[in-house]
Amino acid sequence: MAGTKPGDLGGIKVGQYIVIDGIACKVMDYAHSKPGKHGGAKVRLVAVGIFEPVKKEHVGPASSRIDIPIIDKRKGQVLALMGDNVQLMDMESYETLEIPMPDDVEGIESGVEVEYFEAMDRYKITRVISK
């Protein structure tokens, strides 16, 4: 899977990012339990998708591996608003991107500087930096 690295399921904490069923998610709840004398510890995670508003759950042994998405946080400038999309220029590479307009970020207009991130070849605007 491109854009991911392996990690220990037992080492995951609330607020970290993981991949469940090919979807990059943020961990919202973590439960660690040891079932008994002869059983291995189990981990139960509840996570919410970064790009889709889906709730995912994963249960597995604490010693197992799970994919962790490589998230690249960057700054960009909004060039134009085009319906449901935002045309954005990366402030480091000057590359032009077309990203879906987020529902939860306010103040996006032409000329403002925003923070966005890339994970698994998808992009999302996270906040407005300056107006």
Curated annotation (Swiss-Prot):
Molecular function per GO: ribosome binding; RNA binding; translation elongation factor activity; translation initiation factor activity
Any one cellular-component term (Gene Ontology): cytoplasm
UniProt-listed InterPro entries: IF5A-like, IF5A-like_N, NA-bd_OB-fold, Rib_uL2_dom2, Trans_elong_IF5A_hypusine_site, Transl_elong_IF5A_arc, Transl_elong_IF5A_C, Translation_prot_SH3-like_sf
Keyword Protein biosynthesis on entry: yes
Modified residues (Hypusine): 37
Coiled-coil portions: none
Location in the cell: Cytoplasm
Known role: Functions by promoting the formation of the first peptide bond.
Family note: Belongs to the eIF-5A family.
Protein name: Translation initiation factor 5A
Gene responsible for this protein: eIF5A
